[in-house]
Each structure stands twice: as C-alpha cells, then as structure tokens.
C-alpha cells in the first residue's frame, strides 16, 4: 500500500531527511509559504517544489501567524500564499488545511473564523481571476486526488 507523509510539524532538516529516505507522497497538511511569511513552520520554495515533485499537497493554514508576519491576517493574505504556490508549481498542489480546531482565537483571521466563512475565500479567489475548476481543486479536489492513491 501507498502512504502519505505529513511534514507540517517537521523541521527543515527532518523534511529533507524524509525526502532523501522515503518515496511516499509528501503533504504539508497545514503550512504556508516561508517567502511570504518567514515563520519556521512555513515551507521554503524548494520544499514546495519537492512536495509537488512527489504529487503532494500544501494545505494552506488559516492561522494569522503563518500568513502574515505582523497583525491579523485576512483573506487577501491567503490569496497571496495561493498565488505564490500557483506561480511556483501550479494549481494541482494547493489545498486547504485550515486548522480551525487548532488555532487559538487570538490567531484567527479577521474575516474567516470558521467553515461558515469559506464563501468569502471562494469569492476572493474568483475576484483574483481563478476559474471555477481551479477553485474546485483548491477547495478539495486536489486532496481527493492525493487521498485516492492510498
């Protein structure tokens, strides 16, 4: 059977050790882009490329600390991370990893605080030029592709 390896809570060294010593699909269930917000939990561009090379997913985490260095993040910050990954490796490697159950109230976004607010993200993706099939991939189809292989 195939396995999926989640590297979200791994150090960068552990990430690269995992790449070197395994062949399974890599996912970051709830991580963002280090080049936009240099939090140690976020992924470098090289890590994002390695995940894509293994046909994995980066699940965008909706925690202000991982989206924006200072202040409270909002949907615009999510879009910045999605655009960065899209430009770097393509739309097929982006999903959501909201971590709504793990984010303290003080680190929640100003406009998306729970699942009921997801239409805000969908509308912002449309305004940002994403097509419906691309939005569907981000909102769940990419995860279904990865999960169907185990």
Segments (PLM) and residue ranges:
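Histidine/acidic residue-rich metal-binding segments in metalloenzymes
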Residues: 1-27, 40-55, 76-92
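Acidic, His- and aromatic-enriched active-site or binding-groove loops in soluble protein domains
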Residues: 26-34
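Alpha-helix N-cap and loop-to-helix initiation/capping positions
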Residues: 39-43, 73-77, 109-116
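Short acidic/histidine-rich active-site segments
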Residues: 62, 89-112
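Active-site environment of divalent metal-dependent phosphoester hydrolases
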Residues: 10-16, 33-36, 65-67, 102-104
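Conserved, mostly hydrophobic/aromatic
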Residues: 5, 30, 58, 99, ...
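Mid-to-C-terminal alpha-helical segments outside catalytic/metal-binding sites
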Residues: 113-150
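A conserved active-site cap/scaffold subdomain adjacent to cofactor or substrate pockets
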Residues: 52-67
